[in-house]
A protein has these predicted regions:
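Residues that flank catalytic or metal-binding motifs in active/ligand-binding sites
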Residues: 5, 32, 83-85, 104
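The catalytic Nudix box helix
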Residues: 36-69
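Functional cleft and adjacent loop/helix regions within the main domain
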Residues: 33, 43, 103-105, 113, ...
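N-terminal strand-loop-strand
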Residues: 1-35
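Short, charged, solvent-exposed linker or helix-capping segments at domain edges/interfaces
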Residues: 96-102, 119-123
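A generic structural signal for short hydrophobic patches within well-formed alpha-helices
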Residues: 41, 116-117
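Active-site-adjacent beta-strand/loop module that shapes the phosphate/pyrophosphate-binding cleft
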Residues: 3, 13-15, 72-98, 109, ...
Length: 140
């Protein structure tokens, strides 16, 4: 398996996206911005397991790998650093209702996809990666 830094999840429920607002701490990347579930790799886990473990830690949701319908590895934004992954999947209303938000972040919500893509306080490279996925859907 190729080394990677971490993985994020774009989880859709109808036309909305599961997002959370990052803590406002100067020592973390993208403080206060709207972000997607996910985070850094631990040990030798696969990209899928990394994303799903982070989802469980951050939102209390347990999904199986077969719920991920799309994935792509993206080069790092910083030269010399490892790449990261974006996966896409769907959530049901029942799963949304069962969310138990963890202790990282200021809060979560289901944000309309179009709003996330245009939001001035969303993590910019995740907006671009979500656009990449959506363009694949239109072309596919």
């Amino acid at each position: 398996m190729q080394p990677f830094n971490g993985a994020k999840l774009a989880l859709l429920c109808d036309d909305a996206l599961l997002v959370y607002q990052r803590d406002v701490k100067p020592e973390i990347p993208w403080p206060g911005l709207w972000d997607l579930p996910g985070g850094g790799r631990e040990d030798d886990e696969s990209p899928e397991r990394c994303a799903l473990r982070e989802l469980q830690e951050e939102f209390g949701l347990v999904l199986e790998e077969d719920r991920l319908t799309w994935g792509r590895c993206y080069p790092s934004l910083q030269p010399g650093c490892l790449p990261s992954w974006l996966f896409v999947g769907r959530l049901s209303c029942v799963e949304i209702a069962s969310i138990r938000f963890g202790d990282e972040g200021r809060g979560w919500l289901l944000m309309p996809v179009a709003e996330f893509l245009a939001h001035p306080q969303a993590v910019p490279h995740l907006q671009e990666r979500l656009r990449d996925y959506l363009s694949q859907c239109v072309q596919g």
